[in-house]
Amino acid sequence: MKFLLIYVPNLRFSNLDKLMKVRLGDICTITGGYAFDSHKMTQKGDYQIIKMGNLYNGIFDLSRNSSFINAPTKKELEYLIQENDILITLTGTTNKKDYGYTVQMEQPKNLLLNQRCALIRASKVNEKYLFYLLNSNDFLKQFYASSTGGTGNQTNVSINDMLDFKVYISNENDQSKISNILNALDKKILTQIKIINDCMSYRNAIVDYFFESLSSDWKQVRLSNILNEYSELHIKDNSIVHATLSKNGIFPKTDRYDRDFLVKDEDKKYKVTHLDDICYNPANLKFGVITRNTFGDCIISPIYITFTIKNNCLPKFVELLVTRKHFIAKARKYEQGTVYERMSVNSSDLLSMYVLIPTLFIQQKIVNIIDIIDNKISNEQKLLNLYKTQKDYF
């Protein structure tokens, strides 16, 4: 008689189907920050005041708008931040999600929490598990839904409302396992981000080397010899993708950034852009918003300028040329306007600029080298996205 051996894997988490629904205030304490007197604040001192800016995007940065006080009172010392405390920002912009950022403290030294932030301290739950719980979609949905208007377009979340949020938690043993796994994934994510940033720095250095050290025999031409401005208009009728422009490229608009509900004219015309066009925002060139269209046919805001690339240049080479910091700095000399936010570079001035261009053969060699680096960056980005997907699973 033969026996069939069936190997059943050990379940990492044994009771995930028995999650407990609890009130957030029953597993932690939440206290608001203190309204420190701005007149007592200095640029240097013994105790630093932690403001919302220090927690922006969930990244703890003490260098952002640093403020200090000396000799805090007994009352002020009640807001001293301790190891494993979780800080969260409570105030943001209406219809945006620029708040609700959380940071868990590691070895804080002489840090005091300012108003518009809250300090969350675990009482009946694993401290690291609580941190990840506060970053979950379930928590954030309740967080943003509970926000109420403040001054102007400001919105706030009440601590009393937060205390009544309902969350699901696992048993103590699984809390430790889950938090350890998520912590390990966070470390992988941070390492992966550093790898990508290092690759980008290497790429930029290589591009600068080509344009600054190898261009002595390149031909000087006006940008108008390379680019041709055009304006093709189209209404938004869902026959073509509506996209947005950034320094990182052209991407389809998401609901989060779609402000078309503010547009009253249903026949409003949008700019059409095609594959390999060069597009830029005249008012945001100072922020690097100039890019090549690698997405394909789409409509974009009519404030953007679109160019086709003439046959004497390779599209990717032109992209490398116009996205360099050195090029943007030269272009900004043509900025017009008195208000910084509205200062812009006209397309006619941009096209009048002189640039150095090599032969098509040299352009192709440069593009081939950068393509190798870009493929490396793309693969590293895919791995980063995989780690993030694994984390989202929890």
For each feature predicted by the language model, list its residue ranges.
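Sequence-specific dsDNA recognition surfaces
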Residues: 25-38, 53-86, 108-109, 224-275
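A short beta-sheet element
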Residues: 51-52, 65, 69-72, 76-135, ...
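Short amphipathic coiled-coil heptad-repeat segments
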Residues: 1-18, 184-187, 191-222, 382-394
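Short, surface-exposed secondary-structure boundary micro-motifs
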Residues: 92, 181-183, 187, 284, ...
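Non-catalytic DNA-recognition/assembly elements of restriction-modification systems
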Residues: 1-6, 12-34, 164, 169-172, ...
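A short glycine-rich beta-alpha junction/loop motif
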Residues: 110-116, 148-173, 283, 298-304, ...
